[in-house]
């Protein structure tokens, strides 16, 4: 297990309104944030891990430290505006692999493959981003804000399709997902989950017991 410590600090404001808030709600200053997690970053037995918790609870900060040299992946970033999705995904890769990835995550509307990413719907953008990750098939990937902007029905099918497709990839590839929605736990069936709200890390067996 790898110990990850998050220490975030900002200015402690002493304005009238800040003082009123502290007094009325018995709130602390809010300038210090500390989170300690013991996570299986260096272990190879798992395929999909999940860090879940409310916004501002340290998920992204943990993700940035999880694997040395690995940055957070934004599914919506880095798409060219002058190329259709089918050309933008793994441009040097196999055509059939790209179309299979698009279909596997539920982006089966072929005309959407011929549009640039920025004109797609929110749900289509998520699926296209997921298909790009699957096509690139990195040994390790950390996906930030997983399903965060999606309608939950769309998120359900998208998350299930991605998790199923990821587990089909060859080799022991590992994917860490960061999400503010607990409903994804049921849909992706992670091998382990860390909840920033409780500070607990549970494996799949413990999750089933709970």
Language-model region placement:
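H-loop (His-switch) and adjacent beta-strand-loop-beta switch element
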Residues: 180-209
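Conserved ABC ATPase signature
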Residues: 116-125
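Walker B catalytic motif
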Residues: 142-154
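Pre-NBD coupling/linker segments of ABC/ABC-like ATPases
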Residues: 1-42, 80-81, 210
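Conserved catalytic loops of ABC-family nucleotide-binding domains
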Residues: 161-181, 185-187
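Hydrophobic anchor residue at the start of the ABC signature
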Residues: 130
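ABC ATPase nucleotide-binding domain signature region
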Residues: 41-107, 181, 186, 198
């Amino acid at each position: 297990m790898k110990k990850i410590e998050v220490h975030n600090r900002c200015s402690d404001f002493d304005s009238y309104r800040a003082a009123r808030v502290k007094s009325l709600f018995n709130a602390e200053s809010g300038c210090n944030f500390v989170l300690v997690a013991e996570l299986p970053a260096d272990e190879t037995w798992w395929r999909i891990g999940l860090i879940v918790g409310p916004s501002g609870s340290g998920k992204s900060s943990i993700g940035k430290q999880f694997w040395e040299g690995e940055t957070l992946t934004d599914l919506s970033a880095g798409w060219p505006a002058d190329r259709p999705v089918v050309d933008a995904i793994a441009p040097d890769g196999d055509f059939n692999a790209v179309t299979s990835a698009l279909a596997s995550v539920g982006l089966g509307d072929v005309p959407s493959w011929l549009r640039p990413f920025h004109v797609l719907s929110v749900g289509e953008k998520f699926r296209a981003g997921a298909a790009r990750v699957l096509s690139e098939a990195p040994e390790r990937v950390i996906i930030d804000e997983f399903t965060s902007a999606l309608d939950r029905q769309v998120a359900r099918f998208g998350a299930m399709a991605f998790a199923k497709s990821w587990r089909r990839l060859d080799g022991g590839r590992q994917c860490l997902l960061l999400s503010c929605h607990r409903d994804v736990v049921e849909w992706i069936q992670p091998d382990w989950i860390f909840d920033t709200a409780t500070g607990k890390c549970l494996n799949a067996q413990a999750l089933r017991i709970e």
